[in-house]
Amino acid sequence: MQRKLDSEPLRTRIYIDGYNFYYGCLRGTPYKWLDLLPLFEKHILPSILVTDNHGQIRAWRLLESPSIKYFTAKIIESVARAGDSVSSQARYHTALRKLHDGRIELIEGYYAVNKMKVKIVDPENPDKAPRECREIQAWKVEEKQSDVNLALQAYHDSITGQVDHAVIVTNDTDIAPALQMIRAHTDVRIGVVVPTSGQNRSANTDLIKFAHWKREHINSGELAACQLPRVIPGRKPTIKPESWYGQPELLQEILDLAIPVRGSRAAAFKWMEQPNQFLSGERPIELVETAEGATRVLQYIHSWIAQQEELP
């Protein structure tokens, strides 16, 4: 017997653990300039089925203000892996706010950097008890409040009747007690999305046992399809960091050759965003996401420059 689709959509809000999402899906990929709203609205949520306590299929609708609560923390320059990490993260946060004003709310915790004493593993006897190992002083970097903020916000929105359907994007078991309380005190449906772009990290059982549904990965095709525009317009345009492209070093080589020809960096990027008949109709800006594609663009530019030098 076919289950009946209830006519009243579930008011849905998404809660994203930004730290967990970055390390699970985005680190080391060309997809960091990610547009979160269409990723969930057009890809993730349409792929799942939500049922109520009676087994009826329920439609959903994203709340408008906000649709997504994104929990993050500003990178500290002294521990950043790259020289532009701080400015690149700031650009991304600005882009989300500008493009989706009101629909994505950024809620910030902070990073704490402290010196602490730790025991090091004995290389000659890795199984030696920690109490017998040598002690050294080391830096400890911790993100603070993001998981607590997510748990509190999800519970608050549920207990105050703001949502019917809470989608939790994390694989952090610290969130599990909040989900348990939501299940115990409300009828809110809970979904858990594990932020990993591969299928090699399974969902934590302590987390998903409180979920009504789960999705255990986000594939690279979905991430690629949901990239922000390269330039977000405004009084001061927000531009995708060049280090966030798939092949930043090759991109720089391309720009070094293209800028003198086109006259400016902006003009060079404008050329790269147009389909190129000499590159099988593909756009150079998309080709530079892979080493093979970027090499094709470089070869074309070198060939074009050589031809120009041979002209009388």
Curated annotation (Swiss-Prot):
Q: Which reaction does it catalyse?
A: 4-(6-hydroxypyridin-3-yl)-4-oxobutanoate + 2 NADH + O2 + 2 H(+) = 2,5-dihydroxypyridine + succinate semialdehyde + 2 NAD(+) + H2O
Q: What is its EC number?
A: 1.14.13.163
Which Pfam families does the record cross-reference, listed alphabetically?
Answer: NYN (PF01936), Xre_MbcA_ParS_C (PF09722)
Residues of the NYN domain: 14-210
State the phenotype upon gene disruption.
Cells lacking this gene are still able to grow in nicotine medium.
GO MF terms here are: monooxygenase activity; RNA nuclease activity
Is Acetylation tagged as a keyword? no
- Keyword Glycoprotein applies: no
Pathway(s) per entry: Alkaloid degradation; nicotine degradation
- One GO BP: alkaloid metabolic process
Which parts form a coiled-coil structure per UniProt? none
Q: Which UniProt keywords apply?
A: Alkaloid metabolism, Monooxygenase, NAD, Oxidoreductase
Uppermost EC category: oxidoreductase
Q: What does this protein do?
A: Involved in the nicotine degradation. Catalyzes the cleavage of 6-hydroxy-3-succinoylpyridine (HSP) by incorporation of oxygen at the 3-position to produce to 2,5-dihydroxypyridine (DHP) and succinic semialdehyde.
Other remarks on this protein: The catalytic efficiency of HspA is lower than that of HspB.
UniProt-recorded name of the protein: 6-hydroxy-3-succinoylpyridine 3-monooxygenase HspA
- Could you tell me which species this protein originates from? Pseudomonas putida (strain DSM 28022 / S16)
Q: Provide the gene name from the record.
A: hspA
